[in-house]
Amino acid sequence: MGSEEDSLEFTRSGIERRQQLVQLAREGDLSLAREFFSDDDPRVRASSIAVLSENDALDESLIALGLSDRHPLVRMSMARAAAQNSSISVLTLLSDEDPAVVEIACWAAGEQTERNDSIIEVLSGIALEHDDALCRESAVAALGALGDVRGLESILEATQDIATVRRRAVIALAPFEGQAVTDALQLALSDRDWQVRQAAEDLTKYLSE
């Protein structure tokens, strides 16, 4: 019973610290956000990252700490921050062992709009080979957002994945053109999943306007 009470108290204490750092940040004081970056509660550390990122106050040392944090909640917060901060390496996050981190990192990669070979290659690998369907879906969406022809083949292959990934892959074809794209859309128009068919119909109509 004692451990349960300790856990409850720890949770309450963590919530209070998060509230404190957020309130001070609203007043322009980031001191607690920096102090709590090494807090014992991962939710507090994650909140520190979010607050510092919103205030453009994540320096190289803090970024390094966040990327190597042992808890996925913290690395997830880093992935969200990466969407608006190109100093945060999405490549590191894309190779994370936790699928939730990878999913967010894929989204961040699409938001960063960096189109180097490594990003395209890693996203393509996730889109086709990751065990988690949400990661594959997020990677396909990122490749579509980047609109780089080097990612097109992976998007086309993803149109043969499970329904949720197929739908995302069809939408991701929007920036591209060519016979392969036309053929993929034509095939999607008769897909067994109605949402895939709808996505293909909408995109076909859009491209013909």
Where do the PLM segments sit?
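Amphipathic alpha-helical scaffolding segments comprising HEAT/armadillo-like alpha-solenoid repeats
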Residues: 1-8, 26-38, 55-68, 84-95, ...
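Conserved hydrophobic register position within alpha-solenoid helical repeats
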Residues: 17-20, 48, 78, 105, ...
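Hydrophobic, well-structured mid-protein blocks that either form specific transmembrane helices
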Residues: 92-114
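Non-membrane alpha-helical segments in proteins
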Residues: 19, 42-54, 72-80
